[in-house]
Amino acid sequence: MWDNKENHDVVGEKNECVCSGPFNSGLYAAMLQRGDVKGVFVGHDHINDYVGKYFGVYLGYSANTGFGTYGLSGAEKDRMRGARVFIIDQDDPDHFETYMVRASDYGI
């Protein structure tokens, strides 16, 4: 998805390799088959925060939320710390908004 950002409406940053599992479990195929999965968001890769749409399912990251783990290096080390916010309208749950907020936005 990252290598074809323009085709998948990717926004955000990729600062480290994707840490996917060692085998294909079929989870993504099962989500597609269900037809009602809107997105899957993870946070394991601490310095990635991008999101894009892949065959109708949003796949995305929330960057590192804590301060006791690795981040970017040097003066940038805490720049990506924060959390992903989701806004879901209960009257239209098929559509949502998501964005990152940074600890630095709150003086942390």
Regions found by a protein language model. Give the residues of each.
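Metal-dependent phosphoester/phosphodiester hydrolase catalytic core
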Residues: 1-12
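Short beta-strand scaffold positions
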Residues: 42-44
